[in-house]
Amino acid sequence: MSGSRILLLEDDEDVAELLVLVLRGAGYMVDLAVNVAQADHRLAERDYELVVADWRLPDGDGIEIANRAAELGARTAILSGYALQMSPERSARHEIWMKPIRPTELIAAVERCLGKPRTPAAN
């Protein structure tokens, strides 16, 4: 499903740069947000097939953004080095990806996620 538009929410500059490079190299259109406020703005501007959000961010929680994106009909994933500490109740509706993630694992996870049926948007 290359060509799909992805929103990546990642506050670590080095991690973000690598993930964007890998995803764009695989043919995906990627928009980067470095904080929750920027991600909210991007979600209001455009539709995304997939939103990948870091869990712990300086100005909020990536799960909140993933929940909003899912309500808009996007597929969602949480990418975190702390994934094992997440509450199953809060993260149940999202894919959970562990950091660090290898480029081949990232692409496989994105392809798997995009191959799933979309969550219907809330009315």
Q: Which positions does each model-derived feature cover?
A:
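Two-component/phosphorelay signaling modules centered on CheY-like receiver
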Residues: 13-31
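The feature encodes the CheY-like receiver
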Residues: 58
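Conserved acidic carboxylate
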Residues: 10
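Active-site residues of response regulator receiver
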Residues: 54
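Hydrophobic/aromatic residues positioned on beta-strands within the core alpha/beta folds
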Residues: 79-80
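C-terminal output helix
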Residues: 20, 86, 101-113, 118-123
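Acidic catalytic/metal-coordinating carboxylates
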Residues: 35, 61-64
